[in-house]
A protein has these predicted regions:
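Conserved catalytic micro-motifs used in adenylation/nucleotidyl-transfer and phosphoryl/amide-
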Residues: 33-59, 98-147, 160, 166-167
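Conserved glycine-bearing catalytic or ligand-binding loops at nucleotide- and phosphate-handling centers
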Residues: 69-74
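Acidic-aromatic/histidine active-site loop/patch
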Residues: 80
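Amphipathic alpha-helical
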Residues: 83-84
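Short, charged, surface-exposed loops that flank catalytic or proteolytic processing sites
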Residues: 89-96
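A conserved acidic, glycine/proline-rich C-terminal tail/linker
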Residues: 148-156
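Single conserved hydrophobic/aromatic residue that forms the stacking wall/gate
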Residues: 177-185
Length: 185
């Protein structure tokens, strides 16, 4: 729980952070299914927070397992993580990998992905799951949350909702938007 004490104890020089409260909609309540889920690969590391359900998770999981992925949990987040990792290995940047992953997954979801230099928010093409953008005080940074009231915990001002199918990228200097590309979920 992000109490004022917990927030005060966080490193004050940190440039980025991610957190997530997950209730079991799919997968078991185990440490292996805890979020954010951190994945390491040859192009770096990323933390993934996911809200929602994939309707094609069993098929994607089977395909990933047949290609050598070893699952430690039972969540849709792990499926997304392995897809994203595979796509990152063949993509010039994380944004392209997220686009490719979104083309493969079907369902209702919102994602927040953190790398060492970027914070990425993505919303399913139909906008079934909420996701919003907030700006930190004095324009000092950005925040993403599934509920606008969560922005209050970090003192962020609500800017707008992430559009259906949209990917929003925040780095140390700016906030970038991609054009929404809706498709049927």
């Amino acid at each position: 729980v992000f109490t004022p004490r917990v927030l005060a104890d966080l490193p004050q020089d940190a440039k980025m952070a991610t957190g997530h409260v997950r209730y079991a909609t799919s997968g078991q309540r185990t440490r292996a299914n805890a979020q954010p889920m951190v994945l390491h690969h040859c192009k770096g590391a990323m933390a993934i927070c996911h809200n929602g359900n994939l309707t094609n998770a069993p098929q994607l999981r089977h395909k990933l397992e047949m290609n050598g992925s070893i699952f430690h949990g039972t969540s849709d987040t792990e499926v997304i993580g392995y897809l994203l990792t595979q796509n990152r290995l063949i993509s010039p940047d994380i944004e392209t990998a997220v686009c490719r992953t979104m083309e493969q997954i079907v369902g209702a979801y919102s994602l927040v992905i953190m790398t060492h230099t970027k914070l990425i928010a993505a919303r399913d093409p139909n906008g079934f799951r909420p996701l919003c953008i907030g700006q930190l005080p004095d324009g000092s940074g950005w925040a993403f949350a599934s509920e606008s009231c969560a922005l209050d915990a970090v003192g962020a001002r609500f800017v707008r909702d992430v559009l259906p199918g949209e990917i929003v990228v925040a780095d140390y200097t700016c906030l970038l938007y991609t054009s929404p590309s809706p498709r049927d979920a």
